[in-house]
């Protein structure tokens, strides 16, 4: 993305603040015009006092300097008031819009598909959000407070200086042109280098976040020194990339200071020569020296602005790239909110591919009646999770239709559809908030009595009441203050509060010990009552009483039936069942043999 296009996008993000932005632009134009009145009046006052008539006619000739001085005071007061007003409103605009864009970005990334979040480090997304919005704030604030006025000053100065004395004006702009060319070369030189710097910043953030997210692993394997050394290595690469950029911008500082001195001396030299020929006045020479000083200052501001924009460009580009990421699915313009559904689910010849080449799901058809339990079985990558993802519209199928209560899910609003579907994940997902707040994710307006009832039905009330703070107990980051079984029972209580007609159990007990699994299964039996339930399972013992079992292989359903029917068919499912049960029988036999062979002690 070009720098100009990037900056256009930055201005587009002003949103509702555009009207204020235009008002500030007009105020900056007036400010830029008024600022040049001071050197003009200064020069005219000198001419009047020295009796040397000016060659220009910008100000009517007068023998008294007092009217000119009064005008100078008036323009000075106007400039002060206008500058203060612009600065105040520019500050407010930048702060308000930073918060608005931050909220918009946060809402946007929460709506992006899980595949995006799987492939993007959460630490990077946080860095992009915070650094991107801070960069927007700095650019907006600097632009409307001073940089836009500086740019307009250059536009105003050209015709004004040509009108007063075209000879001095040509010299002034020739010298400033050289300054601009040299600065532009430095800007182009450092643009790619700064992109490399920001890439190193992203690596640094991701590595630090990765280590902090696995701090238990780092400590248990005594990897603290190694991780610190790894971070130091990335930081050294960052510093190595940053130093050349800083050197080039130090050169810009030298060019700026040299340009100021050379320009003032050149104008004085030419002005003296012209004055000796009667082609300019002393006041005009002083006026153009003031112009030169003012122009160099404005060019410095413009260069500073371009410099800051160059420094911020990688952050802004990264921010806008995430902001431009398109959700895999969206609400159709004519989508409807279905209200509460009964739970009749139909897959009709559904096919889906992630890459457009190998099908993840192919010609899948089945019907789940309200209240039935449908189990999905198969090896990893067989298509179970993909089928469920199509149900709650993480993706849309390339062909076929997924229906609920006879309605194509693509015709329903996302919020309306997902309000009717509850999910109990394999790893219970909890916020770093109180237990009550985590449960109210399922039902924000739930009363305390409803929380207790849901926790009781989910076999969670006992451990909640054991805590001194009860429902106000903080779950910790990702629920780490609780055990795996406690987290899972809270997840089930949350689903009970949501009370959806359709429930998805994604390996809900696979990571639990036998005792905890028994408690969780009691809670699951409670939450499954009266709901259409889909169970993704590797432990076949957990789906013994499923209404129907679908056996997946390479995106297709190769077997379908009840547990007993599938075992009787002696197919793939029967092999899985025998393998799992044989492992359990062999384990029990080994324990029994060890017990029999052990010596008896009296």
UniProtKB/Swiss-Prot annotation:
In NdvA the ATP-binding domain (NBD) and the transmembrane domain (TMD) are fused. Belongs to the ABC transporter superfamily. Beta-(1-->2)glucan exporter (TC 3.A.1.108.1) family. It is found in: Cell inner membrane. Keywords: ATP-binding, Cell inner membrane, Cell membrane, Membrane, Nucleotide-binding, Sugar transport, Translocase, Transmembrane, Transmembrane helix, Transport. Its EC number is 7.5.2.3. The chain crosses the membrane at residues 22-42, 68-88, 146-166, 167-187, 254-274, 276-296. It is a multi-pass membrane protein. This is Beta-(1-->2)glucan export ATP-binding/permease protein NdvA. Homodimer. It catalyses: [(1->2)-beta-D-glucosyl](n)(in) + ATP + H2O = [(1->2)-beta-D-glucosyl](n)(out) + ADP + phosphate + H(+). It is an enzyme of class 7 (translocase). ATP binds at residues 378-385. It comes from Rhodopseudomonas palustris (strain BisB5). Residues 345-579 form the ABC transporter domain. PROSITE patterns: ABC_TM1F (PS50929), ABC_TRANSPORTER_1 (PS00211), ABC_TRANSPORTER_2 (PS50893), NDVA (PS51317). InterPro entries: AAA+_ATPase, ABC1_TM_dom, ABC1_TM_sf, ABC_transporter-like_ATP-bd, ABC_transporter-like_CS, P-loop_NTPase, Type_1_exporter. Residues 21-311 form the ABC transmembrane type-1 domain. It holds the Pfam family ABC_tran. GO terms for molecular function: ABC-type beta-glucan transporter activity; ABC-type oligopeptide transporter activity; ATP binding; ATP hydrolysis activity. GO terms for cellular component: plasma membrane. Its main location: membrane. Involved in beta-(1-->2)glucan export. Transmembrane domains (TMD) form a pore in the inner membrane and the ATP-binding domain (NBD) is responsible for energy generation. The keyword Nucleotide-binding applies. PANTHER family: ATP-BINDING CASSETTE SUB-FAMILY B MEMBER 10, MITOCHONDRIAL (PTHR43394:SF1), ATP-DEPENDENT PERMEASE MDL1, MITOCHONDRIAL (PTHR43394). It comes from the Bacteria.
